[in-house]
Each structure stands twice: as structure tokens, then as C-alpha cells.
Amino acid sequence: MVIGDLKEPGRINVLKYSIADGPHATIEPNRTCNIRCHNCYNLDRDVVKSFEAVKSEIDLVARKRNLQVITILGGEPTLHPELDQIISYIKSKKILCHVLTNGLRLLDDPEGRYLDGLVRAGMDKILVHIDSGQSHVYRDVEEARRTLFSRLEARKVPFSLSVTITNEDQGGLAGLAKRYAKYKYFDGILAVVARDPLPPNIQKVELSDEYRSLARNLGIEPSSYIPSNLSDRDVNWLIYSYFINPLTGEAFPISPLFDRLHRRARKLASGRHAFVFPPKPSFHEMISAGVCLADTIVHPRKWPAFRRFLRSGSLLRAGRFHYIAIQTPPEVDEQLKKLRFCYGCPDATIRNGMLTPVCIADLINPLNGNQGHVEVNKDWYREVYSAMGELYL
């Protein structure tokens, strides 16, 4: 997708942080997992790092980036025996801590003792990755989500849904956003379109199709985007910020102008760029009507959307502040013969001491030196690490 595909390409914010100013990173304490996702990018599934090794990676990435948040992923992070200590160590750095999980261990613990331990350790939010790509584990994906969401809601734990959009799931984000708006501590969706940098003939999901679907079915336009390493015209992340009425499912999109002001205010207040806006459900409900009214006054064309948004709501508690972020994984540009990936890689991890895009780390810098059946692409290695500031050509 390119910026010209958007309805108003001149208005949208471009989030193009320097490597040092990047507000987000990921940590992989273990590569082991208890399921197999159809589109998983992990090739090495045997490594479990020691707590000391993970601490060293946290220290290193905190020196390389001005972090607001670290997301712990894997593998499946709940399999690491010291996950609670890892969370506590991240929090000791004054950094927000999110955990991306397939939810299996949490669902197998109906009393929630393990979840309670993560909360006590300081976990700020859970990203729940349960989708149709795991249907071999969850016979009823919707039932699994509802069960886990209810447990998180009861404990007032903020949570998002993480999904991979396959050809069978295209156009479904609006329905998910409306369906889960009823949960007070649900704050949005992180989606990845199914693509792969290796197979040349794989049928790929297009980001532009999801953009049109959200405009048609939820009535929202994106407020910001992240370009690729090759061109600012490329749209590799598409980010929506909006308020949603949980009673009616009507959404009110936050304009790029208000999104820009919000981000600048956060930067001035904290000295860091905002990768996420920490969920504050009651506060956001209280200010929702006022923010939407102010946005409408500045952009009068939004009056119809504002009226629909308030329908069946209250001026004091009209809606909830949510996000949708859609990512396009790395792929080879057939014309330039170069690897296209997100500018600055918002999801970078530490791989063998180097800041590395997590979704291609196994292809360019595997933990064990090689993957046996996959040869390290030296051209990609040079391209990626020069773009990430780790290699000077």
C-alpha cells in the first residue's frame, strides 16, 4: 500500500522516529511454544534464555532506545519460568511492560493464580493472540476469547486482541472492534496481514483492502502511519485512533490533527514518544464527548459522525478510546530487489547484541549462528543492519 491510496494522504501523520527515539521494543526470553501458528516467523523453537541473559538484553535495548514500552513475546512467554521476574525488572526501568500471549496457559488456569502473579509483578497490559490460525488448539475461537477476556475484565487488566489477517479473515476487523467494545478494559486490535518474504507465489492479503473495509464498515480513517525503509510513500503500519460507543458500535475517528497534538503533549510531558496510550477507561469515557465535540468544531464535516456516536450514549460517558494498528510484514521489493520493512522497526528486538527487526531476526541473525535449512541472507543482513544503525557501510 502507498500513501496515495488513502482518502486524504496529505493530512495523515507520518511516524518516523530515529533509531534512538523509538519508543517500543520487544524481548524474547524464550523461543519455545506450546502451539504452532500457521504464519509464525520463528524458525528456532528450542532456546530458553536465563534471567541474567534477558536482563542484559533489557539493559542493552534501553540504552539503544528511549523506550516507553517493552513487549515480551516469544515463542510463548508464559512458558518462561521467570516471567514474573522479567516483568518486574522491566518495570524497575520505569518502562511499561506488555505481554503477548496465545492465552493457553491462562485458559488452563481457571482460578487465575498465574495471571494474578503477573499482575503483581507489574504487567501493564496483555495482548491476546487467539485467532483462526490456532483453530487446531481452540475449537471455538470466540469462546476462548470470551473466556479469557472475562477473566481479564474481572481483574481490571487492560488487554488488546492480536490477530493475523488471512484470506479467510479479510474485512473482519470492524466486526471485532464492535463486538469487544463492551469490555471496559479492552482497548484495541493489533493486526498483521498474512505475508511472507520467502515464498514468491504465496497469496497475500493487501493492507489497502483492510483500509477500505474499515472505512466502509466502521466509518474511520487512519490518523497516522509508519513508512518503510525504502520510501515514505510506502505504508507499512496503518494506525487508527477513535472513540467507540459500546452500546451502538458507532465510532468517531480522531483526526490526524488531534492525534498529532496528543502525541506532542505526551512527548513534552514524559520526554518520550508515545507508542501506546495507556488505557484509562473511566477517564476516557468522561472526556470522550468533549474531545469528539472539539474535533468536530475544527472539522465541521464530522457532525454526522458525532451525532451517530452520541446516539444512545451520554455526554459524560459517550464512548471508549480504542486503536487499531495494522502491520505489513517485510517482503522483497521486486523492482528494487531489496527487502522492504518498517522504518526503524517499531518491534525491534535484541539479537546477538544487535537491534534487529523481530520478524526477520531468524533469517538474518539466528541465535545459534545458523538455521540449518535456511541460509542467512547476507544482502538482507547488510541492508537491515545499516538501516537500523548497527552497521556502517
Predicted regions mapped to residue ranges:
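Radical SAM enzyme core and accessory elements
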Residues: M1-Y17, P246-L393
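N-terminal capping/interface segment
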Residues: D5-P9, R31, C40, L96-H98, ...
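Conserved, mostly hydrophobic/aromatic
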Residues: C33, V99, G353
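Radical SAM/AdoMet-radical enzyme domain recognition
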Residues: K55-I72, H80-L198
